Amino acid sequence: MANLGEIVQKVRSKNAGPFWLTVDIFCGTPHAYAHVIAKLSSATVAKAFGMNTQDIKRFDIADLHVVKFSLPRPHVQGSTLDPDMHGASWAALLAELPLEN
């Protein structure tokens, strides 16, 4: 079983405003894209981040071989409780997620 980061070209996360984060998965190839959309569910992402599935928005962008997840920030960006103002560390968590072959 390989980690998501070993299968795809790049996993990136960033701000999507003060209340949302976005995680972009650049698959690189049609094969990797097909594998990711088949094996990585919104429920799996929600569980990895300790969130409810219905709070996760998923966008499959076939022409670019990209899967994008938008999720609510646990704390408002820049608040004293926000440990990652730029939202960059979320990608590392998802990249380490094991995916079935």
Model-derived regions, located:
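Long, contiguous binding/interaction regions
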Residues: 1-101
